[in-house]
Every structure is written in C-alpha cells, then in structure tokens.
Amino acid sequence: MKNLVVVDHPLIKHKLTIMRDKNTGPKEFRELLKEITLLLAYEATRHLKCEEVEVETPITKTTGYRINDKDIVVVPILRAGLVMADGILELLPNASVGHIGIYRDPETLRAVEYYAKLPPLDGDKEVFLLDPMLATGVSSVKALDILKENGARKITLVALIAAPEGVEAVEEKHSDVKIYVAALDERLNDHGYIIPGLGDAGDRLFRTK
C-alpha cells in the first residue's frame, strides 16, 4: 500500500470513534464528517505549490505566499461525498466543484455511473476526489476513470475509512493516485461492507434507512 497515507491525529481518532457509534445521530454525524475532512485536507493539500506575493503589513512590505485555489477542483462522489466537500471548501473556498454519481450494485458489487458534471479538467488542475468509504474500491476506481477520461492528471483521493481491498483495487488501476484516509480498517464482510467500519455513510447522513 505504497500510496496510502493514514493521517494519525488524536482529534481524528476521537471524532471517528463518535462517528462509528451506532447511536450517533445524523446531525452530529454530518458535523463530524465535515470536521474530519477538514483535518484530512490539511495533510492531503501539503503538496500544493505556493507562489510568492508581496504584501504590505501595518509595519512594512514583505514577501508572502499564496495558493491559487482557482486551479483546484473538488469532486465528491454522490451522495455522502457532498458533506466532505463542505469541509475541504472551508479551506479552499475558490476551488471549482464537480459531481460524480455512482452507486454500488448490491448484487454484483459493480459500480454504476448515473451522473457526472465536471468543470474543465486539464493536466495542471489539482483534483481532490472525495469518497467517505473506500470499501471494494469499485466506486473510486470508476470515478478515477471518469476524471482521467476528462483530462485530469493530478488526482488525490481523500476517504474517511478504507479497507485493504479497496486500497489495493485503487493502487492496481491507478498507481499514480495518492490516498489519504482517517483509518485503515480490517477487511470487508460478505456484503462488501467495511469491518468494523461505521455502516452505510450515506444512510446515516441522510436517514434513508
């Protein structure tokens, strides 16, 4: 798992534990997902380049640094990825936002695309793909396929929890993509859910079950 970075931080561990609790309600669950995404983004954006700018303080002029976040694209996988987008956009408010709709067929576990709306993607854009649960990896692999078909070349995948199977699937198909997660869990069960995981993130966010 050469491309995997598990962001080891006490705040992330604390907040993720609350999210795992089956008794945590949707309001708190949403807030925690947004907060953890913000913390993950701190590390996932570490490679971004800064340009020097001159700034005038109340005392004197000095050299500062600026990220051109207009060259950044945030792409959540619907629907649970939407909340993650809110977190990263607090740090990068001028980033463009695309959306990819993919669901995993419960019988075949294959990824099915039902929606894609993306801003212009060229090789210079820094793209952050957001997928809360990297389980089998089929949804993330499909989304990465779509992004690259549309011209993206610099892509970082940010997930809340990953299973080893999902990480391996992404690395096999997209070895150039770095993966940042809050936790690497044990395995998948027979239904393709992460163990111990936190259940279906989308259902818990939107109370659809």
UniProtKB/Swiss-Prot annotation:
This protein's record includes keyword Ribonucleoprotein: no
Chain positions recorded as uracil binding sites: I194, G199, D200, A201
Pfam families the record matches: UPRTase
Gene Ontology MF annotations: GTP binding; magnesium ion binding; uracil phosphoribosyltransferase activity
Comment on bound cofactor: Binds 1 Mg(2+) ion per subunit. The magnesium is bound as Mg-PRPP.
EC class: transferase
InterPro entries noted in UniProt: PRibTrfase_dom, PRTase-like, Upp_B, UPRTase/APRTase, Ura_phspho_trans
Cofactor: Mg(2+)
Positions in coiled-coil regions: none
Entry EC no(s): 2.4.2.9
GO annotation, biological process: UMP salvage; uracil salvage
Catalytic activities: UMP + diphosphate = 5-phospho-alpha-D-ribose 1-diphosphate + uracil
Binding site for 5-phospho-alpha-D-ribose 1-diphosphate: R79, R104, D131, P132, M133, L134, A135, T136, G137, V138, S139, D200
Regulation of its function: Allosterically activated by GTP.
Keyword annotations from UniProtKB, A to Z: Allosteric enzyme, Glycosyltransferase, GTP-binding, Magnesium, Nucleotide-binding, Transferase
Pathway: Pyrimidine metabolism; UMP biosynthesis via salvage pathway; UMP from uracil: step 1/1
This protein's record includes keyword Isomerase: no
Source domain of life: Bacteria
Function summary: Catalyzes the conversion of uracil and 5-phospho-alpha-D-ribose 1-diphosphate (PRPP) to UMP and diphosphate.
NCBIfam families registered for this protein in UniProt: PRK00129.1, upp
Recorded family membership: Belongs to the UPRTase family.
Name of this protein: Uracil phosphoribosyltransferase
Organism listed in the record: Thermotoga neapolitana (strain ATCC 49049 / DSM 4359 / NBRC 107923 / NS-E)
Lineage, broadest ranks: Bacteria, Thermotogati, Thermotogota, Thermotogae, Thermotogales
